[in-house]
């Protein structure tokens, strides 16, 4: 039971809203991972709700997913929440969770070396797939965001929350929430506390001091999209096991297929499909 609690393996019970808010009234918030994994009671409760959505909406989950969520350097977390009253003192219920991995900006030399050897480095899934399949040395130099997971509360499936969360995510990366009158120093930046190699070499589980961090010294758990500076991206993409409902979902969000694996996955029997959506206007897209 202790291991289950630490790794949040046991599925938490999902809350049920009193009524269903209109998707147009919901907002997408950025989640600060440093605060989310601070061991504070409030943050821990929300983390359990997020993991519960993951477990309820996907056939395969493991502690590795939790590790990626916590400290993968290029990952970002977003949650779609119902309207929040200004005087509310309660955590909002997550209707949908989106986990994103930033990819790309691979040097042309690295692409050439990998293509010549028929191998690719770990990570940067979509850039490497497109580069290998199309023998394209330019695409990997672009910057993109890959949707790793998008999980909606199973009680609210087919109600438009996933589509709304994805729409707001694309709007964020296109800079539609940016306030041009704001000073750049006013943006909230996520900082993940990391240890050095020297600290790891001298560390020991016997003398580790694991404790709840002072919540007063932590950044807010949530940030509005208008408070975050979006990364300068060229596209948003996704890689998933092809099914008719999933293809319909991504196509409706204006994603276009660029790759379909010829052989099926041994575990699921599905064929991997990669779809992307360019960001910005068509006049700005040179590729």
What is each of the regions a protein language model found here?
Residues 156, 160-165:
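Conserved acetyl-CoA pyrophosphate-binding loop and the N-cap/start of the following alpha-helix
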Residues 1-61, 68-75, 79, 85-94, ...:
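Terminal substrate-recognition subdomain of acyl/acetyltransferases
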């Amino acid at each position: 039971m202790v291991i289950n609690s630490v790794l949040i393996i046991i599925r938490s019970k999902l809350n049920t809203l009193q009524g269903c808010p209109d998707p147009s009234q919901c907002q997408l918030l950025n989640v600060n991972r440093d605060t989310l994994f601070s061991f504070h009671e409030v943050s821990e409760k929300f983390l359990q709700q997020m993991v519960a959505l993951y477990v309820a909406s996907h056939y395969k989950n493991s502690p590795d997913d939790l590790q990626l969520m916590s400290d993968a350097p290029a990952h970002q977390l977003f949650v779609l929440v119902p309207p929040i009253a200004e005087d509310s003192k309660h955590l909002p219920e997550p209707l949908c969770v989106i986990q994103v991995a930033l990819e790309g900006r691979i040097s042309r030399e690295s692409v050439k070396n990998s293509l010549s050897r028929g191998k690719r480095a770990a990570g940067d899934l979509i850039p490497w797939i497109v580069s290998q399949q199309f023998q394209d040395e330019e695409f990997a130099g672009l910057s993109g965001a890959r949707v790793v997971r998008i999980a909606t509360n199973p009680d609210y499936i087919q109600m438009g929350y996933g589509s709304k969360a994805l729409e707001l995510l694309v709007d964020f990366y296109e800079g539609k929430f940016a306030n041009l009158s704001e000073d750049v120093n006013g943006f909230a930046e996520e900082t993940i506390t990391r240890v050095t190699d020297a600290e790891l070499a001298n560390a020991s589980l016997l003398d580790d001091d694991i404790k709840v961090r002072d919540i007063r010294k932590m950044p807010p758990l949530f940030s509005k999209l208008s408070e975050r500076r979006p990364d300068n991206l060229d596209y948003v993409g996704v890689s998933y096991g092809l099914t008719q409902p999933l293809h319909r979902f991504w196509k409706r969000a204006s994603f276009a297929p660029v790759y379909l694996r010829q052989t099926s996955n041994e575990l699921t029997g599905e064929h991997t499909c990669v779809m992307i959506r360019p960001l910005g206007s068509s006049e700005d897209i040179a590729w």
